[in-house]
A protein has these predicted regions:
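Short, well-ordered coil/turn elements that cap or connect secondary structure elements
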Residues: 15-17, 36, 82, 103
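Glycine-rich adenosine-cofactor-binding loop
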Residues: 1-13, 17, 22-25
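Short amphipathic alpha-helical segments
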Residues: 9-10, 34-35, 69-73, 98-101
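Adenosine-phosphate binding glycine-rich loop
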Residues: 74-149
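Short, charged, surface-exposed secondary-structure boundary motifs
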Residues: 31-33, 52-54, 116-122
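Rossmann-like NAD(P)-binding element
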Residues: 39-73, 78-88, 92-93
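Adenosine-nucleotide cofactor-binding segment
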Residues: 17-47, 67-68
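Conserved nucleotide-binding/hydrolysis micro-motifs of P-loop NTPases
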Residues: 3, 27, 64-65, 92-95, ...
Length: 149
């Protein structure tokens, strides 16, 4: 429910994501963000149980260490019976133990992963822009040659 959490929640809602489940150590902050995004607020103690029923969980706390440990997630995943779970860890230090990404049907992304994905996408876009420039230059030259007497 900090600045990052608010920005992410609003961005997801603006892109059509369904109902958000919001939690915070401070209940009033969770309630305010849930109301602003037409979501549901839950107590901070209940977040592990919610992992059993969501498809994506985004962590962005200021906790001094990992909140989600591999043993906890292993139990969650057993109860999910193979349903995939996408975990996005925006926290520094990380909220999710790296070993969680090694569990079956868990897809864990952290800031470094997201940065690498964004950089690759930017590189691909720049490559396509260059292809378009070359195609436009070729067509402009062809058009100019046709106009010459």
């Amino acid at each position: 429910t900090g600045e990052i959490g608010q920005d992410v929640a609003r961005a997801l809602r603006s892109r059509g994501l369904g109902r958000l489940v919001v939690t915070s150590r401070r209940v009033e902050r969770a309630a305010a963000l849930a109301a602003a995004t037409e979501g549901d607020a839950i107590s901070f103690e209940d977040w592990p149980a919610v992992l059993e029923r969501v498809g994506v969980a985004i962590f962005a706390t200021s906790a001094p260490g990992a909140l989600l440990e591999v043993e906890t997630l292993r139990g969650v995943m057993e109860r999910r019976r193979g349903d995939p779970l996408f975990l996005i860890d925006l926290a520094v230090p990380r909220d999710i133990e790296a070993a969680c990404g090694g569990l079956d049907s868990v897809f864990l992304y952290n800031l470094e992963d997201l940065t690498a994905i964004a950089n690759e996408n930017r590189r691909l876009r720049e490559s396509e822009i260059e292809k378009c420039r070359l195609a436009l230059a070729e067509r402009a030259e062809h058009f100019w040659l046709r106009l010459r007497p």
